[in-house]
UniProtKB/Swiss-Prot annotation:
Belongs to the WD repeat WDR12/YTM1 family. Component of the NOP7 complex, which is required for maturation of the 25S and 5.8S ribosomal RNAs and formation of the 60S ribosome. The keyword Repeat applies. Present with 6670 molecules/cell in log phase SD medium. Residues 8-89 are annotated as: Ubiquitin-like (UBL) domain. It comes from Saccharomyces cerevisiae (strain ATCC 204508 / S288c) (Baker's yeast). This is Ribosome biogenesis protein YTM1. Component of the NOP7 complex, composed of ERB1, NOP7 and YTM1. The complex is held together by ERB1, which interacts with NOP7 via its N-terminal domain and with YTM1 via a high-affinity interaction between the seven-bladed beta-propeller domains of the 2 proteins. The NOP7 complex associates with the 66S pre-ribosome. Interacts (via UBL domain) with MDN1 (via VWFA/MIDAS domain). The keyword Repeat applies. The gene is YTM1. GO terms for cellular component: nucleolus; nucleoplasm; nucleus; PeBoW complex; preribosome, large subunit precursor. It comes from the Eukaryota. Residues 99-460 are annotated as: Sufficient for interaction with ERB1 and association with 66S pre-ribosomes. It holds the Pfam family NLE.
Length: 460
């Protein structure tokens, strides 16, 4: 096969909703030397576009990252083959927008649905809310150690968790977020109207080691992952949880609490108005620290967790039982769900991301694909709000990478913008969040919250 002269029969098609991006369904011949740019020129010519639209191309569901010649060679096909080539809008580079300075390492980030406010959890033990100009709107103090996870519950509540082994529910104010009728009824019932913004609404106790991950469902439930190998299942409705007596915990001689921890607990008890609650249940099956837990985005009675014990577990939250376990060959540190694709993306200590289908039976090791490109632990994952195939990952190698799961290599790599960052010294990324109206937010060891463009990245 001569690459410069040979041609191959192709048929272009697209699943784009915009009818103006649809070409006529007519087969044509194209040089097999063409790559993405050349194919994009052909499609734009067929569309008669005044302003060229950048496209990506897929053949049999696989992103084309080489020439047509190389693709045919890889698949063992001749130029006499006929190819159905799908085209889709290309993702634009996630250009740098802004950075905010924090007092200490930033471990966790969140943005409420439809909100333009960022919340961060820091190793200095403080939760902060930020506007997009980098101004701190509010600080929430109460944890007695580093914070490892933060999440919005509603526009008047958020939850945090940390190394002090507790979760805290906080009163906040975010006018960008709207309450559901259930949330409004709950807050009216709990008489939170008179509680000051920034105050702790409740302390949730039950874990025996640092709590490093939390997730929130739309039915007033919280999941927490802990280094005590367990997962906590909680409610934001106080009357559904058992009251905890902190004095019983402190005075129990069999309880292995350090002297310093006992002193801290007694200090926090000075505010007798703070509710203390126990979990609805503790889910136990992991044999090593649990790194992250999430709700199924389409069924809040199901949860997924990953652990240093190399497993992905599926949980029935109604019965509090593990119903499926997948075993890998490496510690798993992060997880995100691509719900429309029925896939779980899992970041590992082996530096790659694996894609698993939770519907497939656990009798065999099932790995759909590995995304390879990071050079250190993959500590955080989040999905693109605009495209079901796109996700981003944060790593201890100091980068955030943007992936299309139809390709095994990253589309883009985001590096730390702060000039004081030293590679391998203070560049670890601990958290990423891809938020609509904000962008790709990342943070970590450099004490910076960095924002890169991630909104409207499929538009010209």
């Amino acid at each position: 096969m001569t690459e410069d002269k040979s041609q191959v029969k192709i048929r272009f098609f697209t699943r784009e909703k915009d009818e103006l991006l649809h070409v006529q369904d007519t087969p044509m011949y194209a040089p097999i030397s063409l790559k993405r740019y050349g194919l994009s020129e052909i499609v734009n010519h067929l569309l008669g576009s005044e302003k060229p639209v950048p496209f990506d191309f897929l053949i049999e569901g696989e992103l084309l990252r080489t020439s047509l010649h190389d693709y045919l060679t890889k698949k063992g096909l001749s130029s006499e083959a006929s190819l159905n080539v799908e085209y889709t809008r290309a993702i634009l580079p996630p250009s740098y927008l802004n950075s905010f300075s924090n007092e200490d390492w930033v471990s966790s980030l969140d943005v409420g649905d439809g909100s333009k406010h960022i919340i961060s959890g820091s190793y200095d033990g403080i939760v902060r809310t930020w506007d997009l100009s980098g101004n701190v709107q509010k600080q929430y103090s109460g944890h007695s150690g580093p914070i490892r996870a933060v999440k919005y519950i509603s526009n008047t509540r958020l939850v945090s968790a940390g190394n002090d082994r507790t979760l805290r529910l906080w009163k906040t104010k975010n006018d960008d977020l709207k309450l559901t009728s259930q949330q409004q009824a709950q807050e009216d019932d709990d008489d939170e109207v008179n509680i000051e913004d920034g105050k702790t609404l409740a302390i949730l106790e039950g874990h025996k080691a640092p709590v490093v991950s939390i997730d929130v469902s739309d039915n007033s439930r919280i999941l927490s992952a802990s280094y005590d190998n367990s997962i906590g299942f909680w409610s934001t409705i106080y009357k559904e949880m058992t009251v905890v007596d902190p004095l019983e915990d402190i005075n129990n001689p069999n309880n292995k609490i350090s002297t310093a921890a006992r002193k801290r607990r007694k200090l926090t008890m000075k505010d007798g108005t703070i509710r203390r609650r126990a979990p609805l249940s503790l889910l136990e099956s992991h044999t090593a620290p649990v790194e992250q837990v999430i709700f199924d985005s389409t069924d809040n009675t199901v949860g997924y967790s990953v652990s240093q014990d190399h497993t992905i577990k599926t949980w029935d939250l109604v019965t509090a039982r593990c119903i499926d376990t997948r075993t890998t060959s490496y510690s798993l540190l992060s997880i995100a769900q691509l719900s429309t694709l029925n896939l779980l993306a899992c970041g590992s200590s082996a530096r790659h991301i694996t894609l698993h289908d939770p519907r497939v039976g656990a009798s065999s090791k099932v790995t759909q694909q590995q995304l390879i490109g990071h050079k250190n632990f993959v500590s955080s994952l989040d999905t693109c709000p605009e495209n079901e195939y796109i996700l981003c990952s944060g790593s201890h190698d100091g980068t955030v990478k943007v992936w299309d799961v139809r390709s095994t290599s990253p589309m883009y790599t985001i590096t730390r913008e702060d000039k004081s960052v030293q590679k391998g010294v203070n560049d670890k990324v601990f958290a990423v969040k891809w938020a609509e109206k904000v962008g790709i937010i990342s943070a970590g060891q450099d004490k910076k919250i960095q924002i890169n463009k991630g909104d409207n990245i499929f538009k010209n």
